[in-house]
Design a protein with these regions (language model features):
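Long, C-terminal-biased catalytic regions of enzyme "large/alpha" subunits
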Residues: 1-82, 87
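N-terminal alpha-helical segment
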Residues: 15, 33-36, 71, 163, ...
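Intrinsically disordered, low-complexity Ser/Thr/Pro/Gly-rich regulatory segments
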Residues: 30, 61-211, 228-229
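Proline- and acidic/polar-enriched loop/turn elements at helix boundaries
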Residues: 35, 107, 195, 239-240
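C-terminal extensions
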Residues: 89-91, 204-268
């Protein structure tokens, strides 16, 4: 039995089914996913790191889905977004695709103190106070403390006659077990990596094709900052702007932008 080394240094037995599931999430067919898993199983060695396994998956998937050679892993891509304003704007766009009217970055008075609110989302009779919690490390956990703070903020806001239906925490990390239990007990909405089942952050991104621009290989931090400063967070937005407009906004050469534009089109 081969053991793989996780990002935190711990080891766990290799599970072939995880390779298949990863390939399927990347829209590979079932036959292709199983064939890739078979190939990888023959190449693995004791202690191989999960990051190296992901690179191998992308390499093999590129034979079946050429567009994947232009992108990095989705989880890593979301981690590369700046917490403010990029990740917050990203969550705002996601909520809009779910039919919410969204207001970003409000300061509201509670009974005791003022609170900086990442987003307010309204739909039908529902008004959500949304907390966006970003992590740079892809294998971090969002702990119960974030949910304790969200609940305290909600109570202080509503004590001053605000009318929020509930608090919602959206994070690009997994949730700790204590966080899940507390969120369920206090009726706090929670969305994170692989949580909740069927409505997790990565599924929402994939189902709506809300791919962050950081997914595209070859974008340096300067260009990403210029795109973010102009509100361009998604691959779809980048394509919609086109090379000419992007050139005026970013001052990056048209030849470089055309290369990026072509990669973006293939991803979509």
């Amino acid at each position: 039995m081969i053991n793989v080394t996780k990002a935190d240094g711990s080891k766990q037995p290799f599970e072939k089914s995880k390779i298949v599931r990863t390939c399927l999430r990347m829209k590979a067919g079932k036959d292709a996913a199983e064939e890739i898993a078979d190939k990888m199983e023959r190449r693995l060695y004791e202690g191989i790191r999960t990051k190296q396994i992901l690179k191998m998956i992308f390499s093999y998937l590129g034979e079946y889905k050429p567009e994947l050679k232009h992108q990095i892993g989705l989880r890593e891509a979301v981690c590369l977004l700046r917490p403010k304003p990029d990740f917050e704007q990203f969550i705002g766009l996601l909520l809009k695709t779910e039919g919410y009217d969204v207001e970003m970055n409000r300061i509201l008075a509670g009974k005791c103190i003022e609170h900086e609110i990442d987003a307010i989302a309204k739909k039908d009779n529902e008004t959500l106070y949304v907390e966006a919690k970003h992590h740079y490390q892809p294998h971090s956990y969002t702990g119960v403390g974030v949910f304790l703070e969200a609940q305290a903020t909600l109570e202080d806001l509503n004590d001053d006659k605000n009318n929020f239906t509930k608090a919602v925490v959206v994070t690009n990390a997994k949730l700790s077990e204590h966080a899940k239990v507390y969120a369920g007990c206090k009726n706090i909405g929670a969305m994170g990596w692989r949580y909740p089942e069927g409505k997790s952050l990565e599924l929402m991104i994939e189902d709506n094709k809300l791919y962050p621009v950081t997914l595209i290989k070859g974008l340096d931090s300067t260009l990403l900052a210029r795109l973010g400063d102009n509100g361009i967070i998604l691959v779809e937005q980048l394509v919609r702007y086109g090379v000419e407009k992007l050139n005026k906004l970013t001052k990056v050469s048209k030849s470089k932008l055309k290369e990026i534009f072509n990669k973006a089109n293939e991803i979509l």
